[in-house]
């Protein structure tokens, strides 16, 4: 919007101030015959002009609940062979410094073919996200059921809640999210909320597997994360800052949580207390490393797949399934042993009572006969 012109390549990233409009112009070839053009808006308002006439527009100012930018999604513009030789102008506007000046791939062709290509390239992460989502729901419900049956708590419930947050984040970052929900802005906002809540979920889970040794430390982390969530959400709701602008605050809190978790792991390893939860510790370290890679990638790539976080969550899931099965086996073994001991003690008490009754009967007969018989002596020896 400052009037500067330059030749660009698509896709690409260019120096545009947040809030300024980047205008891309080109002349459609004479043999143009596509019926649709499409581009992915990355937190951008998009307008298509053909021969100076507005053909398509994507702007969520009237539908988004809060924020200054439109949620990322694919924007389609209907075209025809009659547009051949006409000027095409695409306007991109974003208030986010990470996305102003971003130009994604422009697609031409049939709408179904474009969606097929998008689905082919992006379906893997979405399928993983749905798998994690349903696995999380099953994990939480199964853990609650086990807790009721065995009258004890299972850490897998906390894993389920962490997985649920991760699945929501992955679905929110999915390139197919506009096919999943009618209002992509709400789902996009949930991605940032998940990052703000994550330190709380991670702290609760780690504190549980560590047996509450560092409850005070994790309580402080949870309190700080809750305050951070309230402050950031308030800034978003009152239009002071968008989530994307204060994202470093949430990522910083998550990084602090990770540092605390790693520190407690090191302390437990030094003091030989980590053996009790070694599988969970290894899985958590792998997941934390992958989550930090995913969180940091927002500053280097335009779109995130969620593949790293999904992989980390699946690792934690399978490790906790194994740990839970082992714990159930131990509980069952202990229960069966207690039941066996109870039955043995009960049998011994019944046998002792029978012998006492028999002895009393023999003694009564002895008193009646006023003498000891060989059989009385024999029974007495057995009882003794």
Would you name each region that the model predicts?
Residues 1-31:
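Extended carbohydrate-recognition surfaces in non-catalytic/accessory domains of CAZymes
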Residues 1-13, 91-120:
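Accessory carbohydrate-binding/adhesion or oligomerization-edge regions at the termini
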Residues 27-50, 88-90:
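Aromatic-lined ligand-binding clefts that engage carbohydrates, nucleic acids, or primary amines
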Residues 46, 50-87, 92-104:
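Beta-strand-rich ligand-recognition modules
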Residues 110, 116-150, 248-270, 310:
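First transmembrane helix
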Residues 138-168:
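Juxtamembrane interface at the cytosolic side of transmembrane helices
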Residues 167-342:
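Interfacial "cap-and-anchor" motif at the non-cytosolic start of specific transmembrane alpha-helices
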Residues 333-384:
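Acidic/His-rich, divalent-metal-binding segments that scaffold phosphate/diphosphate chemistry
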């Amino acid at each position: 919007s400052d009037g500067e012109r330059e030749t660009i390549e698509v896709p690409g990233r260019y120096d545009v101030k947040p809030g300024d409009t980047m205008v891309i112009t080109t002349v459609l070839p004479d043999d143009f015959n596509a019926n649709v053009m499409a581009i992915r808006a990355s937190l951008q308002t998009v307008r298509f002009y053909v021969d100076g006439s507005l053909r398509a527009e994507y702007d969520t100012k009237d539908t988004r609940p809060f924020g200054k930018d439109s949620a990322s999604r694919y924007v389609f513009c209907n075209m025809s062979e009659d547009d051949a030789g006409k000027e095409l102008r695409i306007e991109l506007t974003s208030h986010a410094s990470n996305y102003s000046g971003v130009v994604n791939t422009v697609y031409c062709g049939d709408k179904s073919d474009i969606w097929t290509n998008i689905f082919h390239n992006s379906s893997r992460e979405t399928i993983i996200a749905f798998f994690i989502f349903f696995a999380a729901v099953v994990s939480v419900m199964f853990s609650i059921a086990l807790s009721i049956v065995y009258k004890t708590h299972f850490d897998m419930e906390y894993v389920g809640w962490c997985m649920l947050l991760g699945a929501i984040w992955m679905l929110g970052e999915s390139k197919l999210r506009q096919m999943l929900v009618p209002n992509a802005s709400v789902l996009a906002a949930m991605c940032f909320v998940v990052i703000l809540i994550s330190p709380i979920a991670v702290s609760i889970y780690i504190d549980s597997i560590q047996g509450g040794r560092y409850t005070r430390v994790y309580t402080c982390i949870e309190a700080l994360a809750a305050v951070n969530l309230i402050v950031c959400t308030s800034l978003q709701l009152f239009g002071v800052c968008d989530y994307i602008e204060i994202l470093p605050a949430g990522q910083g809190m998550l990084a602090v949580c990770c540092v605390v978790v790693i520190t407690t792991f090191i302390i437990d390893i030094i003091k030989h207390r980590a053996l009790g939860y070694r599988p969970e510790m290894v899985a958590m370290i792998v997941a934390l490393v992958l989550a930090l890679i995913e969180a940091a990638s927002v500053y280097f790539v335009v779109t995130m797949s969620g593949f790293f976080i999904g992989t980390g969550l699946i690792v934690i899931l399978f490790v906790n399934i194994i740990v839970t099965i082992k714990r159930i086996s131990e509980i069952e073994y202990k229960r069966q042993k207690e039941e066996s001991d109870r039955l043995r003690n009960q049998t011994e008490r019944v046998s002792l009572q029978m012998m006492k009754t028999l002895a009393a009967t023999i003694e009564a007969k002895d008193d009646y006969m006023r003498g000891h018989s060989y059989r009385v002596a024999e029974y007495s020896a057995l009882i003794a």
